[in-house]
């Protein structure tokens, strides 16, 4: 187990924070429309979590499932939106089809791609590419189950969300306004005497 954790930690530590990361933050900070996240499979779970983290920290965002996009959910997008697409291979047909249709049919052309493979078609469809690194070693015994790659995606998405949070001077009271339930709601609650739990 220690070896698995070590390999995932190594993958995260190998992320190269380049100028593309700064460009991505600025693009999201100045997005005139909505921030949309998407991804398929395990990458989709990271995209969904990214939207949830952004929404609770001052950047309104939501997840669109790429398969459902072809069945009407593409209509949730509009021209000024910014899409953040997650795919290690950059070859997931559902993601590529969604991005192609969003561009052709709705004029949505602002895409940040989070991907690893050098020959990833997602790179060509993205205005900004956040490179996960080309040689991420999966600790899986048969080298197939995505875990280190997913850990890298999670780290990249958290870095974006928390940097945006800082740039927006997001406060504890701002957080509580969006997240008033549970433990985090209780520790960020102003001393009003009103119990929102």
What residues fall within each predicted segment?
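Internal, active-site/partner-interface "lid" segment
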Residues: 124, 137, 165-197
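Amphipathic, soluble alpha-helical interaction motifs
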Residues: 11-18, 101, 163-166
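An N-terminal, well-structured beta->alpha segment
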Residues: 1-30
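Catalytic cores of large soluble enzymes that bind and process phosphate-bearing ligands
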Residues: 4, 16, 42, 148, ...
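Glycine-rich phosphate-binding loops that contact phosphosugars or nucleotide phosphates
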Residues: 34-164
């Amino acid at each position: 187990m220690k070896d698995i954790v070590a390999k995932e930690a190594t993958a995260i530590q190998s992320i190269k924070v380049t100028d593309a990361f700064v460009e991505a933050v600025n693009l999201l900070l100045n997005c005139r429309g909505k921030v949309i996240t998407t991804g398929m499979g395990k990458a989709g779970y990271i995209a969904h979590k990214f939207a949830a983290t952004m929404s609770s920290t001052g950047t309104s965002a939501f997840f669109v499932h790429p398969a459902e996009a072809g069945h009407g959910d593409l209509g949730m997008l509009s021209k000024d939106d910014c899409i953040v697409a997650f795919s290690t291979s950059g070859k997931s047909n559902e993601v590529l089809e969604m991005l192609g249709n969003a561009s052709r049919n709705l004029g949505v052309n602002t895409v940040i791609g989070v991907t690893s493979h050098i020959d990833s078609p997602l790179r060509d469809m993205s205005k900004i590419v956040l490179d996960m690194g080309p040689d991420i070693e999966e600790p899986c015994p048969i080298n197939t189950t995505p875990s280190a790659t997913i850990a890298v995606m999670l780290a990249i998405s958290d870095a974006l969300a928390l940097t945006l949070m800082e740039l927006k001077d997001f406060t504890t009271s701002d957080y509580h306004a969006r997240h008033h339930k549970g433990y985090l709601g209780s520790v960020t609650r102003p001393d009003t005497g009103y119990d929102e739990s």
